[in-house]
C-alpha cells in the first residue's frame, strides 16, 4: 500500500508539472501571436504587445553584423496590410521554454523570400515578451531565373 501511495503521489506531481508547462508554453506563444498579427495588419500596436521596450533585432546584412531597436522597427510599420498580403504565409514553428526563458521560431513565407525568425522570450512578472530577435532571410528566385 505504501508503494502505491508513493507511486500515486509521483504520478500526480508529474501530471501537474506537465499541465503547468503546457499552460506556460501557451502563455509564451501570446507575444509570438501578436508579432504575427502585427505583420498581417501592419499595426505597430501588436508589435508593442509582443516586444519588450528595450529589445533589439540582431542580423547580418551583406556580411555585416547589424542591430535595430524594436522601437525603430515598430516606427517603420505602415499601419496597413502589405499589398501582397493574400500571398503571404506565416506561422509559429516551435516554442521551447524552461522556467522563465524560452525561444520561439517563426516562419514568414513571403513571395519575395522566406524569413526564419528566432525570438528570445523572457517571462517578466506575469507576462512573456520577445526581448531579442535574430533572423535569416532566404530570397526566392523569380520564375524566369
Positions of PLM-derived features:
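Short, low-complexity N-terminal intrinsically disordered segments enriched in polar/charged residues
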Residues: 16-37, 41-45, 49, 142-143
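Bacterial N-terminal signal peptides
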Residues: 7-15
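N-terminal, post-signal-peptide region of Sec/Tat-exported proteins
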Residues: 43-81
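Positively charged n-region of N-terminal signal peptides that target proteins for export
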Residues: 1-4
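Hydrophobic pocket/interface hotspot
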Residues: 35, 47, 55, 104, ...
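Surface-exposed, charged secondary-structure patches
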Residues: 21-27, 60, 70-114
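Short beta-strand edge/turn micro-motifs at domain boundaries
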Residues: 114-141
Amino acid at each position: 500500500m505504501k508503494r502505491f501511495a508513493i507511486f500515486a503521489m509521483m504520478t500526480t506531481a508529474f501530471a501537474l508539472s506537465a499541465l503547468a508547462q503546457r499552460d506556460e508554453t501557451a502563455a509564451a506563444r501570446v507575444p509570438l501571436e501578436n508579432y504575427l498579427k502585427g505583420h498581417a495588419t501592419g499595426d505597430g500596436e501588436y508589435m508593442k504587445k509582443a516586444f519588450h521596450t528595450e529589445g533589439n533585432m540582431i542580423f547580418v546584412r551583406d556580411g555585416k553584423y547589424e542591430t535595430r531597436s524594436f522601437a525603430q522597427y515598430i516606427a517603420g510599420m505602415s499601419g496597413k496590410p502589405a499589398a501582397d498580403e493574400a500571398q503571404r504565409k506565416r506561422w509559429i514553428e516551435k516554442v521551447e521554454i524552461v522556467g522563465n526563458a524560452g525561444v520561439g521560431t517563426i516562419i514568414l513565407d513571403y513571395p519575395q523570400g522566406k524569413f526564419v525568425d528566432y525570438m528570445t522570450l523572457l517571462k517578466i512578472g506575469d507576462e512573456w515578451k520577445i526581448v531579442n530577435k535574430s533572423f535569416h532571410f532566404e530570397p526566392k528566385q523569380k520564375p524566369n531565373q
